[in-house]
C-alpha cells in the first residue's frame, strides 16, 4: 500500500494532524504520523507512529540538552534530525505537514530533501506570503491555512481535508516519468530572452530533453540542483540575470553558489549575458526608495525592472567571470554585443551601450581564458537567430570535448 507521512508537532497540532492522517487512510493510503514536537513537557501519545525522541536520534551531531531549552535552537535541531530521518525511510510515497511559522520552518527542509516528483504538501499560515525560503528549488505544494492551524473548525476542516485529499490523490495517481532515451540538458530563460531560448530548444530537442528554467532565483537553483544530481549532461545558461538581483538587491536573486554546480561537476557549460541589463522588483510601489530615481520600466503590473548602471555592470561582469574561473570543465561564454535582452536594443527602454560595454569589458578583463574556458564576442543581439545558432554550435562542441 502507498504510504504518506504526516508530519507536525502533536503537542500543539495533534488534532489537526490526526484529522489529516485519518482522511488519508480513508482515501486508500497508509499514513504514518510523525511527531516532531520540541516541548520538554510534551508527553508521548500512544497513537503516534514515530515519537519525537526517535526522530531526534537521527541528528548527525546531537546538541547538548541545555541548548534544547532555547526553542529556536530546539526547532533547528529537530529540523536537521527530521531531514535525516525522512531520508532514511524507504517507504515515503508522499508527505504532508501542517504548522505555523515554527512548524513550517521545521518541516520544510525535510520536504526539500525528497526527490523531485515525490508528492509533498505543506499547509501553513505563511503560505500566502513569500514562500521561496520554504520551497527552494523543489516541488513542494504549499497551501494557505486561512485560519491558524489551531483547532478544527468549519474553515480548517475544509482546508485540511483538501490538503489530505490532494496528497492522497497525487500518491494514488502517480505518473511515472516518461521513458526518454534523450539525455537532458538545462537552459535558463527570462521573458526578454525567450526568442533565443526557444530557438535553441527547437534546434536541440530532437536529440536532447530540453529542460527550461525560469531565471527567478529559485529557477537557477533548480537548474543547478539537477546538474549537481547528475540529471543533466550539460547546461546552456542563456539568462544569468539572477546575478543582477543578487549583487544590486532585486527580488529574483541567485545565491553565492551560482555556477557552483558546474565547477563541482565539470559538466559542459555554455552561458551568456541574458537580461544582465535589469534588476527585478515587484509592483512599482514596492521599488525601494533609493532606486526610485533610476531608469525603471513596468514589465507588467506585478514586475518593475530597473536598468543596471555601468558601475553595476562592471561588478556583475567581474563576479560572473570570477565564478566561471572556478570551472575546470569546458566553458564557453558568449557575449552578444548588440544587446542582452529584448529591451536592450535601439529604441528600447534599456538600450545603454555604455553599460553594456562596462559589462563586456569586465568579463574580458576578469575571465582567465584557457583552451577549455573561452569568451566569445559576436556582433549580434541575444535574440538574433544567428546567436541561438552559435549557442547550439558551441554546446555541441563542448559536449564533444567533455
Curated annotation (Swiss-Prot):
Signal peptide extent: none
Record keywords: Plasmid
Pfam families: UPF0261, UPF0261_C
Record-annotated disulphide pairs: none
Superkingdom in the source lineage: Bacteria
Classification via InterPro entries: Tobamovirus_resist_UPF0261, UPF0261, UPF0261_C, UPF0261_N
Family: Belongs to the UPF0261 family.
Protein name: UPF0261 protein y4oU
Organism: Sinorhizobium fredii (strain NBRC 101917 / NGR234)
Amino acid at each position: 500500500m502507498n504510504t504518506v507521512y504526516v508530519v507536525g508537532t502533536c503537542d500543539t497540532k495533534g488534532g489537526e494532524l490526526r484529522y489529516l492522517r485519518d482522511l488519508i487512510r480513508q482515501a486508500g493510503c497508509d499514513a504514518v504520523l510523525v511527531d516532531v514536537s520540541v516541548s520538554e513537557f510534551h508527553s508521548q501519545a500512544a497513537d503516534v507512529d514515530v515519537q519525537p525522541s526517535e526522530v531526534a536520534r537521527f541528528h548527525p551531531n546531537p546538541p547538548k540538552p541545555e541548548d534544547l531549552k532555547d526553542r529556536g535552537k530546539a526547532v533547528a535541531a529537530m529540523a536537521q534530525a527530521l531531514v535525516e530521518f525522512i531520508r532514511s525511510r524507504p517507504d515515503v510515497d508522499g508527505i504532508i505537514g501542517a504548522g505555523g511559522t515554527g512548524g513550517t520552518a521545521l518541516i520544510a527542509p525535510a520536504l526539500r530533501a525528497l526527490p523531485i516528483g515525490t508528492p509533498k504538501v505543506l499547509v501553513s499560515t505563511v503560505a500566502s506570503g513569500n514562500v521561496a525560503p520554504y520551497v527552494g528549488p523543489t516541488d513542494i505544494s504549499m497551501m494557505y491555512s486561512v485560519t491558524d492551524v489551531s483547532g478544527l473548525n468549519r474553515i480548517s476542516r475544509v482546508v485540511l481535508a483538501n490538503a489530505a485529499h490532494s496528497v492522497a490523490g497525487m500518491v494514488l495517481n502517480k505518473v511515472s516519468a516518461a521513458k526518454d532515451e534523450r539525455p537532458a540538458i538545462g537552459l535558463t530563460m527570462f521573458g526578454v530572452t525567450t526568442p533565443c531560448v526557444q530557438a535553441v530548444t527547437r534546434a536541440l530537442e530532437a536529440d536532447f530533453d530540453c529542460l527550461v528554467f525560469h531565471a527567478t532565483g529559485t529557477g537557477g537553483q533548480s537548474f543547478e540542483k539537477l546538474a549537481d544530481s547528475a540529471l543533466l549532461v550539460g547546461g546552456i545558461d542563456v539568462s544569468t540575470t539572477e546575478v543582477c538581483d543578487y549583487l544590486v538587491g532585486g527580488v529574483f536573486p541567485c545565491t553565492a553558489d551560482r555556477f557552483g554546480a558546474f565547477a563541482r561537476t565539470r559538466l559542459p557549460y555554455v552561458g551568456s549575458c541574458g537580461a544582465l541589463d535589469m534588476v527585478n522588483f515587484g509592483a512599482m510601489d514596492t521599488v525601494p526608495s533609493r532606486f526610485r530615481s533610476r531608469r525603471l520600466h513596468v514589465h507588467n503590473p506585478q514586475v518593475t525592472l530597473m536598468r543596471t548602471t555601468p558601475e553595476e555592470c562592471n561588478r556583475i561582469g567581474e563576479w560572473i567571470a570570477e565564478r566561471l574561473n572556478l570551472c575546470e570543465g569546458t566553458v564557453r561564454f558568449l557575449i552578444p554585443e548588440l544587446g542582452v535582452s529584448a529591451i536592450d536594443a535601439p529604441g528600447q527602454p534599456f538600450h545603454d551601450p555604455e553599460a553594456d560595454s562596462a559589462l563586456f569589458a569586465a568579463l574580458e578583463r576578469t575571465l582567465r581564458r584557457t583552451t577549455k574556458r573561452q569568451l566569445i564576442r559576436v556582433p549580434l543581439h541575444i535574440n538574433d537567430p544567428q546567436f541561438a545558432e552559435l549557442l547550439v554550435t558551441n554546446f555541441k562542441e563542448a559536449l564533444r570535448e567533455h
